[in-house]
A protein has these predicted regions:
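Alpha-helical transmembrane segments of polytopic membrane transporters and translocases
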Residues: 9-10, 21-38, 194, 209-211, ...
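Membrane-proximal transmembrane or re-entrant/amphipathic helices at the cytosolic face
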Residues: 388, 394-397, 409-461
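Signature of the first transmembrane helix
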Residues: 1-43, 78, 137, 190-219, ...
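Interhelical loop/hinge segments that connect adjacent transmembrane helices in multipass membrane
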Residues: 123-126, 150-157, 166-206, 211, ...
Length: 461
């Protein structure tokens, strides 16, 4: 989280909104091909390796099948991708960006982080990610000087991804006997295709948003959307890391001890609510100060989109929980695909209806409403078929939202007294965090008990 916050303000001040918008528009187009290249290997790989990781022969079998399929799929997609870019894209800048981004399809071949995650190699993943990102930050600060370095910026991001994947591959290789094999092809291809469809239905949300903005609203609106999205994502990813870390354990419990699975799921949701609720209110109330500090005045059009993304963060956190921790873990991919497809179509229809008046804020609003419907569908299914509802929508988690909403008058008062954006930002964060923890401490909150700040009791509030 810290490194993107350090480097992104620098990039946004060196590259214009139009350049950032063109990069993001190109990335949205490339993503459609990247998903087909990776199929559903990442999610499927974590789930299956987690289940067989104590049996080395099975680990080798699953890994080799997925790795071999990944090589073949990425090579086939790369051929089709470059042919389309060569003959179908006429804008010179966009074509160059797309050619450079296509290298990521080769990087995808070595993207076996799912194996390391399934084996809970989080220390290695963390150290490697920090080192690679530090090198990325160094390269950007040394090489990116002005708007003429747009292509160079894309090259740096591509090389960083390639290095990251190769290092992970070398580390994982020590624990494997790697062979090019399609022996288990028929066994894994069906669930892979289901997850592929699932991934494709999810691009009917965020990725389609940028595509529509690029076509109907122009590069500047894509940039405003993308800057707000990157700020939200940088924070959201750090918060939701708990969900990804818990995936292997929950996957094991779901198959062997369902009571423990539901208990751990409830705990994970509680931690998520503890963090997501206050951060979302911070983002909404301090959007202007964050944008001025983070991106500068040329991105002032990002303030309103960031406010909508602050609301969206709460909704999408529950989408992720139901999708990854409930539906996929319990092998309900088909239902997830159906629900995502329904809501993705709703989102697409909304974008089409308002295409002539689209802007970054309206796009986020349409997507947020679509995801609300998606959460409702998955929650209803989880309750009816798996007996899961209170584990996710526990009443005790509501206090995190209520306490977070109390930040609003505090921040408004600080803004009334102080004008300087940095002072407003720092004071708001400091005072609100202090208020939040004092209130939670006074009611002996479960999370504070878990981290040792409050003496544990038999019944947690």
């Amino acid at each position: 989280m810290i490194l993107p916050i350090l480097v992104m303000p620098y990039v946004y001040r060196k590259l214009s909104p139009n350049s950032i918008g063109m990069i993001e528009y190109g990335t949205s187009l490339f993503t459609y091909f990247s998903i087909f290249g990776m199929l559903g290997i990442y999610n499927y790989g974590i789930r299956e390796i987690s289940r067989v990781r104590n049996v080395q022969s099975e680990v080798n079998r699953v890994f080799n099948a997925l790795f071999s399929i990944g090589i073949l799929s990425n090579l086939c997609v790369a051929i089709g991708y470059y042919l389309l870019v060569l003959f179908a894209v006429h804008d010179t800048t966009l074509k160059t960006i797309l050619f450079l981004l296509g290298i990521n399809l080769m990087a995808n071949i070595f993207n076996i982080e799912w194996f390391n995650e399934a084996n809970e190699e989080f220390k290695f993943i963390t150290i490697k990610s920090i080192i690679v990102r530090c090198l990325s930050v160094l390269a950007i600060f040394l090489l990116i000087e002005n708007n003429n370095d747009t292509y160079l910026y894309v090259i740096i991001t591509v090389i960083v991804l390639l290095i990251n994947n190769i290092v992970s591959f070398i580390y994982a290789k020590k624990r494997l006997v790697i062979q090019f094999s399609f022996q288990s092809f028929t066994k894994v291809i069906t669930p892979l295709l289901w997850i592929l469809v699932l991934n494709n239905t999810f691009i009917l949300y965020g990725n389609l948003d940028k595509t529509f903005l690029g076509i109907y609203a122009g590069e500047a609106e894509v940039a405003y959307y993308s800057v707000a999205n990157k700020i939200m994502t940088a924070i959201y990813t750090s918060v939701m890391v708990l969900m990804y870390v818990s995936y292997p354990k929950l996957s094991f419990y779901a198959q062997n001890d369902y009571v423990s699975y539901k208990r751990e799921l409830s705990k994970m949701v509680r931690y998520t609510s503890f963090l997501v609720m206050p951060i979302s209110v911070f983002l909404y109330m301090l959007s202007k100060e964050i944008i001025l500090l983070f991106a500068g005045e040329q991105y002032i059009g990002t303030i309103q989109p960031l406010r909508f993304f602050a609301i969206y963060m709460i909704i999408t956190s529950f989408t992720s929980i139901f999708n990854h921790q409930v539906m996929l873990i319990n092998r309900r991919e088909k239902k997830t695909v159906l629900f995502c497809l329904i809501c993705g179509i709703i989102n697409s229809i909304g974008l089409l209806i308002f295409r002539d008046t689209l802007n970054s804020s309206l796009v986020i609003l349409i997507t947020t409403l679509s995801e609300c419907i998606l959460v409702g569908l998955m929650a209803f299914y989880a309750y009816k078929k798996m007996g899961i509802l209170s584990e996710v929508f526990a009443f005790c988690n509501l206090k995190y939202l209520i306490l977070s909403l109390a930040f609003i008058p505090i921040i408004l008062l600080i803004k009334y007294v102080f004008i300087n954006s940095v002072i407003v930002l720092l004071l708001s964060i400091l005072i609100c965090i202090l208020f939040y923890f004092i209130m939670l401490y006074s009611c002996k909150d479960f999370i504070l008990q878990q981290i040792g700040l409050v003496e544990q009791k038999n019944v947690a509030i």
